Amino acid sequence: MKIVVLDGYAANPGDLSWDELKSLGECTVYDRTAPAEVLERAAGADILMTNKVVLDATTIAALPQLKYIGVLATGYNIIDTAAAKERGITVTNIPAYSTPSVAQMVFAHILNITQRVQHYTDEIHKGRWTNSPDFCFWDTPLIELSGKKIGIIGLGQTGYNTARIAIGFGMEVHAYTSKSPFQLPPEIKKTELDELFANCDIISLHCPLTDSTRELVNAARLKQMKPNAILINTGRGPLVNEQDLADALNNGTIFAAGLDVLSQEPPRADNPLLTARNCYISPHIAWASAAARERLMQIMLDNIKAFLDGKPINSVIK
């Protein structure tokens, strides 16, 4: 059994072990694989693991021995699943491994913005507190979350976990979701999109990326928001029109944004959000806590073992 990991570095930069995977067969782990290297490295593989390396129909057709593709992520749009299905190849993903970590990052951004953590750290490094005549140096008010309205777009596991944390802060939680009001706990109010954008103080994106949600947040939606509103995106970068968001931040249409994802990663140097006013960006790391990556590695092993036992789990091909 030949196993090849095409881009293992993101999930395991060296702090975790590949030994259990290597015990399942002849295993080669590459940190990164360029598109031109895929066919050579994947040749003869029965099991192929990828995080972001694209496996399109042409590539899949050129790997006749391939029986299983394991995506080391929840999203699997990098795989031509129709081509895999046609050739009888099992494709699995890693669901729900990072849910607590991503919800935690939502509030890392919210708290950084509302408590101005980065701002005050920067000012202290400049000596402004040292030179202050008062014991408490401040030059901008902080924002209390209790009583504020948060709108959550997409109430899957991460959206629901975000809602639970918000409830703990005493926030009023609104959700745009396909679930009926009867399926929601009483603390979460089902809200239509127009009302959510217009009335919520914070909006957090947790919906999947589809044709209907691409650039869901655009100039028209941003104009619906309050001037003191905050946008959080830990979901998918293309949910947001980036130029529209940069314009809205720079002209004061909304107050701030906290982003963990962008439409292109790594971003181009001319991405307008990199220099936008009150735009705080983390480099797609919400998923990457040590605990989350440990879960990812364990689910990866469980998926492969189930496949080898003839009882695949977490298959994305129905």
Give residue ranges: language-model regions.
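Phosphate-binding beta-alpha-beta segment of Rossmann-like dinucleotide-binding domains, i.e.
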Residues: R87, P95-K149
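N-terminal glycine-/charge-rich "phosphate-binding" loop or analogous flexible N-terminal tail
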Residues: M1-A45, H174
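Rossmann-like adenosine-cofactor binding region
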Residues: L55-A61, H174, K179-P272
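Short beta->alpha connector loops at strand-helix junctions that form conserved
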Residues: D31, L72-A73, I89-P100, T177, ...
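Rossmann-like dinucleotide-binding domain for NAD(H)/NADP(H)
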Residues: V91, E172, N228-K318
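Hydrophobic/small residue at the entry helix of a nucleotide-binding pocket
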Residues: T158
